[in-house]
Amino acid sequence: MKTGFNRRSFLRNAGVGSSVLALGPLAASLATSTAASAAGAADFDTIANRVGHDSVKWDGALRNEHIDHVVAGMGIADMDYKAAPAITAALRKAVQYDNWGYIDMGQPGRKAWLKSIVDWNHKRYGITAMNEGNMAITTGVHAGILATMAAYSPPGSKVLLATPIYNGFYGDIRATRTVANESLMKFNNGRWEIDWADFEAKASMPDTKISILCNPQNPVGRAWTKEELTRYGEICLKHNVLVLADEIHCDFISKGSKYVPFASLDNEAVVKNSITYKSVSKSFSLAGMKCAWFFTTNPEVYKATVFHNHADLNTLGMYAAEAAYAGGEGWLNDCVAYISDNHDFANDYIKKNIPMIKVGQKPEGTYLQWIDVTAIADKIGAKKMADDANQQAKDAASKMGTDYSGRAGMAEMRVQTPEDMVQHWMAKNAFVQLNAGTSYGLGGANHMRMNIATSRKTLKAALDSMAAATKKISA
């Protein structure tokens, strides 16, 4: 990882060559600002005011739930904290330049930029299988996954998933006209575990071509062990199923748990039968910057994925990512520790104060809680509410001469689930927005996903509001 700042290297890494010498003030001051910001203590008790800034998490909650205020947006997976100071400083300097045309990623700076990513992964995660020759840049993990799917999972083939799992994968599956091959995990002693017999049975189906692994697992919070990943990989290798490892949440590991990169496994054949996707977007809350990458030790998989990877790089995203690596590691370490404590706080609070919500063991990874809302759904009659909403939509569609479809793409015509009703109820009664569990596949029924990457004060306010709302219906 780079520890200092080199003006020429910075310009090269931006891919704009000597024509950007007007960025001299940026280059001259970035090292100082990065070092200064890295030295200061991070403040996660003070969050950005995201309302009024078109935030999906906050403004989206107001718009979608038709409420006039929100105590906490706890849905989509981004963080409420102010960005690492090193990132903000770099971007402020970068926008002093007055032209945002195409950049030439064929310049020598591209190698320096890739090296900074490789160095970070070597140092922080011990991923020695990664190098500048077997990785490539893309705009996001989804874009990378779609590129691999285009090469290895033809329309109609099956995609193996251990569920509940990140709902975005289902969008990728629909986009590629493939089919989800779901293996429901077991919930044992408050912990989700793969049902290995079922997983292998699904992997052995002849039309199962790929398996998307989420490591750590969103939304259930498992940080997979070396033994679990090895078994996962060996089953997939045995049945000629390519592993697509989404490790975007890898930095958010709770105290006492460990992130094991799939590419670090001892079995070289298992590793070669995989491709890994990573990004700065979760670690440093840079989802809007569109900067990610993938790597694999398999030359064939690399070439095929690169061939289908039609994603360009966001210039500011590159500046932000480089600044994060140069001066953001301390901030990130503090952030991870703060979120681990948030998990403890949330688990303890819910167990003591919200008996209508059940939680399992503390999540080992991610900044997401997977909560059981069965009691709430039963109490508010969520199933009947969903049935009524679906019938009303069907009747309205019939009057318009339109076929009713749960996949119509129109909010008023989408099939509603009991979990959707709990989501709406929570928004209107506690003014807290959560994600409905059914969108995460098999095992999502009676569950909600809750994002705790916010200040302790906001987290407590949200839980207080949820406790008060559920208390009113608990009698």
How would you name each of these model-derived features?
Residues M1-L21:
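N-terminal secretory signal peptides and thylakoid transit peptides that target proteins
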Residues A39-G140, A326, I473:
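N-terminal small-domain helix-loop-helix segment of the aminotransferase-like
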Residues M149-I173:
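Conserved PLP-anchoring active-site segment centered on the Schiff-base-forming lysine
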Residues T176, K238-H239, A430:
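Helix C-cap/helix->beta junction micro-motif
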Residues F187-S257:
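Active-site phosphate-binding strand-loop segment of PLP-dependent enzymes
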Residues N273-K352, M356-E364:
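PLP-dependent aminotransferase class I/II
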Residues I339-N347, V359-I376, A386, A393, ...:
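Conserved glycine-rich beta-strand-loop-beta hairpin in the small C-terminal domain of fold type I
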Residues M385-A475:
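PLP-dependent enzyme catalytic core of the Aspartate aminotransferase-like
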